[in-house]
Swiss-Prot record:
Protein name: Cytochrome c-type biogenesis protein CcmE
Cellular compartments annotated: Cell inner membrane
Record PANTHER family: CYTOCHROME C-TYPE BIOGENESIS PROTEIN CCME HOMOLOG, MITOCHONDRIAL
Annotated GO MF terms: heme binding; metal ion binding
NCBIfam families (UniProt xref): PRK13254.1-1 (NF009727), PRK13254.1-5 (NF009731)
Gene: ccmE
InterPro entries recorded: CcmE (IPR004329), CcmE-like_sf (IPR036127), NA-bd_OB-fold (IPR012340)
Family listed: Belongs to the CcmE/CycJ family.
Length: 159
């Protein structure tokens, strides 16, 4: 039997089609596993990944649900009021809207009026943001370009 007739035989074509089909099924199965793994990881991290929201991005749902979030912007000038040894009340603004923050705890050295700040906490039933941790920002050097641009849109970043 010549080699040409062997390659053109129907049984060889069937075997090659089966192998091709098997490879395709393996690739599709791997893609499915990767998609499922990505979905599970995204689902598991949806509440742990917390970027900050500026006051103008806070929704009524955020306030009503009282879930933890990060509020970012600038400490509004003229609003800082120290209460007792470790308490402070101030407003975080993006020059579109502002939110009142009530915080009790260690206040970072970089915390001051006009300075960038991210406050971790939640909204209470009265709609005040109860801070659990203050992250004072030195300047826009520590922000992503997108974040600095969002803040600069409404307020000049002070150095």
């Amino acid at each position: 039997m010549s080699s040409q007739s062997f390659h053109n035989s129907p049984s060889l074509r069937v075997i090659l089609k089966q192998r091709k089909k098997k490879r395709l099924l393996i690739v599709l199965f791997c893609c499915l596993i990767i998609a499922i793994a990505t979905s599970l990881i995204t689902y598991a991290l949806r509440n742990t990944v917390s970027f900050f929201r500026m006051p103008s991005e806070v929704t009524k749902e955020d306030i009503l649900m009282g879930r933890p979030l990060r509020l970012g912007g600038f400490v509004e000038k003229g609003t800082v009021e120290y209460v007792g040894d470790r308490g402070v009340i101030f407003f975080v603004t993006d020059n579109v809207k502002h939110e009142k923050v009530i915080f009790s705890g260690a206040i970072p050295d970089l915390f001051r009026e006009g300075q960038g700040v991210v406050v971790e906490g939640y909204f209470d039933k009265q709609g005040f943001f109860i801070g659990t941790r203050i992250l004072a920002k030195h300047d826009e050097t520590y922000m992503s370009r997108e974040t600095a641009d969002r803040l600069n849109k409404h307020h000049r970043v002070e150095k």
